[in-house]
Swiss-Prot record:
GO terms for biological process: protein quality control for misfolded or incompletely synthesized proteins. NCBIfam families: PRK00277.1, PRK12553.1. This is ATP-dependent Clp protease proteolytic subunit 3. It catalyses: Hydrolysis of proteins to small peptides in the presence of ATP and magnesium. alpha-casein is the usual test substrate. In the absence of ATP, only oligopeptides shorter than five residues are hydrolyzed (such as succinyl-Leu-Tyr-|-NHMec, and Leu-Tyr-Leu-|-Tyr-Trp, in which cleavage of the -Tyr-|-Leu- and -Tyr-|-Trp bonds also occurs). Its main location: cytoplasm. It comes from Nocardia farcinica (strain IFM 10152). GO terms for molecular function: ATP-dependent peptidase activity; ATPase binding; serine-type endopeptidase activity. It is found in: Cytoplasm. Belongs to the peptidase S14 family. Gene3D superfamilies: 2-enoyl-CoA Hydratase, Chain A, domain 1. Its EC number is 3.4.21.92. Cleaves peptides in various proteins in a process that requires ATP hydrolysis. Has a chymotrypsin-like activity. Plays a major role in the degradation of misfolded proteins.
Length: 221
């Protein structure tokens, strides 16, 4: 078995720095309180929307957790919506976000657009029951925690790492089982290799509850 740093992700590689993106546009808003400069992420936050659009690592996990806690403090009885388009990432960062989602009083709705792979798929499933969704062409990928590479050390060190990998795998399986209604043994079998699901497949599997229609089409009906 090939082993590496346990901070590596469910995707099987240690998370790297997020890729550079285009410059985030800013805009001016006028209100009775005056004029302020804003950007899309600030505007989403004002609407109680959190956007996970990068891999799951310590930095993104801290950002997500901070937003969840602030939104709960502002109004613990109003829903929070988390939009997800992520390739996954660190297992420990995943569980930090997961625990915070379960900890806050507010319901956390989850919506996948693009993809929710690996760790991100668990976060998608962890939304409040009845409030988990995908857009029509989103995809979901689930698989076991898989650590690649190599480490130097004694046999006892390798045994410790192997035991930790098995613990992580069982935790992921029981977590997915809890939120999908599947048996943990079924989850283990299905995640032994990459399992790729369409939006409808994810609904049937129990990861989400709804496949959203396009708003334009809904308005025309």
């Amino acid at each position: 078995m090939a082993l590496i740093d346990p901070r590596a992700g469910l995707s099987g590689i240690a998370p790297s720095s997020p890729q550079a993106r285009y410059i985030l546009p800013s805009f001016i808003e006028h209100s009775s309180f005056g004029v302020k400069e804003s950007n899309p992420y600030n505007k989403l936050f004002e609407e109680r929307i959190i956007f996970l659009g990068v891999q799951v690592d310590d930095a993104s996990a801290n950002d997500i957790m901070a937003q969840l806690l602030v939104l709960e403090s502002l109004d613990p009885d109003r829903d929070i919506t988390m939009y997800i388009n992520s390739p996954g990432g660190s297992f420990t960062s995943l569980m930090a976000i997961y625990d915070t989602m379960q900890y806050v009083r507010a319901d956390v709705a989850t919506v996948c657009l693009g993809q929710a792979a690996s760790a991100a798929a668990v976060l998608l499933a962890a939304g409040t029951p009845g409030k988990r969704a995908c857009l029509p062409n989103a995809r979901v990928l689930i698989h076991q925690p898989s650590l690649e590479g190599g480490i130097q050390g004694q046999v006892s060190d390798l045994e410790i790492q192997a035991a930790e990998i098995e613990r992580m795998r069982r935790l992921m399986e029981t977590t997915l089982a809890r939120h999908t209604g599947k048996d943990p043994d079924t989850i283990r079998k299905d995640t032994d290799r990459d399992k790729i699901l369409t939006a409808e497949d994810a609904k049937e599997y129990g990861i989400i509850d709804t496949v959203f229609d396009y708003r334009k089409l809904s308005a025309q009906k």
